[in-house]
């Protein structure tokens, strides 16, 4: 079973079983919480060309909470990290009306990051809090920009989604996908499972094991957990094969 989005590094877990989020402002993994295994694990600030992170899959981006005070400074580093094979997604980036810089600044920072994702052909992990309208505006802009430049629009995945099925339908109609954390709308879970579209499960920053999140979701759906695991597999059509 795959944990689609986590901030907690645990080196006792199979490296290919989770997507570890790293903020581009952090020095490697030093800003992350250790959830088990070896404490104090860290990555170098500048990843060398042959860096593979021991098989761990990464998403790297600038969180909207950290867009104040010159977000542009971090984009060269993000562009470099985005080229690494172990970085399979860009993010989390996005919009949050409750925290961070002004919405205009957050939108500019997100525009820059989704453009990087389009150039390297990798999906985007999106943080969105009470900014659905603005997110839809950016998605529309993004598709137009990609088409005009000959890029393939990449999938955006809304992580930690707590909205209703109607919201999920709107997002999915625009080429986005949904990832559910430990708190979600049960009707949305049922809709995602029955509609046939890909979706994902995640731990984010909670210490509940991903196995428990899958177990609870399978009980609520009334299905065997193996069926759920097969539905939440990002390697089918989202992530590129990792070659190093």
Question: Which residue stretches match the model-derived regions?
Answer:
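Mid-domain alpha/beta scaffold segments of enzyme catalytic cores
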Residues: 1-244
């Amino acid at each position: 079973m795959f944990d689609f989005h986590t901030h907690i590094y645990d080196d006792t877990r199979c490296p290919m079983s989770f997507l570890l989020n790293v903020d581009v402002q952090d020095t490697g993994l030093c800003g992350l919480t250790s959830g088990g295994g070896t404490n104090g694990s860290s990555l170098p600030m500048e990843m060398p060309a042959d860096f593979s992170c021991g098989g761990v899959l990464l998403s790297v981006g600038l969180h909207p909470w950290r867009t104040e005070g010159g977000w542009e400074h971090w984009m060269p580093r993000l562009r470099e990290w985005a080229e690494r094979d172990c970085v399979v997604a860009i993010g989390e980036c996005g919009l949050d009306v409750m925290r961070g810089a002004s919405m205009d600044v957050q939108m500019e920072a997100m525009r820059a990051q989704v453009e990087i994702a389009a150039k390297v052909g990798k999906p985007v992990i999106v943080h969105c809090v009470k900014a659905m309208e603005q997110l839809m505006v950016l998605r529309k802009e993004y598709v137009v920009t990609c088409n005009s430049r000959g890029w393939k629009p990449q999938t955006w995945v809304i992580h930690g989604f707590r909205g209703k099925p109607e919201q999920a339908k709107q997002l999915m109609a625009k080429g986005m996908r949904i990832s559910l954390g430990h708190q979600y709308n049960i009707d949305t879970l049922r809709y995602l499972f029955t509609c046939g579209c890909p979706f994902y499960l995640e731990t984010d920053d909670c210490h509940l094991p991903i196995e428990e999140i899958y177990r609870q979701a399978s009980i609520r759906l009334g299905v065997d957990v193996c069926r759920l695991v097969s539905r939440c597999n990002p390697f089918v059509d989202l992530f590129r094969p990792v070659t190093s």
